[in-house]
Amino acid sequence: MAIVGSMRQEEIWNTETAQNYDTPGAGMFAPEVLGPTVDRLAELAGDGRALEFAIGTGRVAVPLAERGVPVTGIELSRPMVEQLRTKVDEATIPVVIGDMASATAPGEYALVYLVYNTISNLLTQAEQVACFRNAARHLAPGGRFVIELRVPGLRKLPPGQEAVVWHQEPGYIGLDTYDLLRQHVVSHHLRFDESGQARLFRSPHRYIWPAELDLMGRLAGFELESRHADWIGTEFTAESRSHVSVYRMPPGRTSSR
């Protein structure tokens, strides 16, 4: 899987990717997907401020800010932030350019959140642990860190094979290729236009089991408060394909740096 090591995040999330990222009303921008996400995050933020790691083009941050939640972002990709700026200005949603595992945003927050599998964009366990610790540093006592993440789909992987199709619909195929030794997966997104021309987007990830994620949280001083299969509170079971996990920094406890 040399492809993982050869793909830098700055190169993946470039101007072309940023300009084609939004799919208004469809996919992860569909109201039935985005609505429950924003509802739950607004509930968790309460009257406090929220910080989004990997804010991107503002898919979640913009509607959350429209709910009256003050939102700040951290984002590695300048082109993604440029797309965000076509929707809101810096005064409405300020953004710090930097790595979510280490960059610092000013102030203290009631909520830090990281959605749509994005913690897996960090390709080492050490970086993922650092991301938890960075979230803890930004939180007020009793604050929460929310992660949305897929459950590794290894049960679908045929013995002796490295690839599995995880989604297929007219005009789109999603395919994952696995490196089991390094816990790496490359997601391949093939989109076909009406003429049959294909556009390929690939992104490397380090997949994380829920138990490993919980240990990362404990290393940073968090306690797992809840875990559900989705944003509307469906029970998390052995058959769940993803989870929304809420970690809480207990009052009186400081982050483990």
Residue ranges and their predicted role:
Residues 129-141:
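A short glycine-rich, Lys/Arg-flanked "PGG" loop and its adjoining helix->strand segment in the class I
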Residues 57-102:
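Class I SAM-dependent methyltransferase SAM/SAH-binding core
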Residues 113-115:
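A conserved beta-strand element that flanks and buttresses the S-adenosyl-L-methionine
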Residues 2-56:
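Conserved class I S-adenosyl-L-methionine
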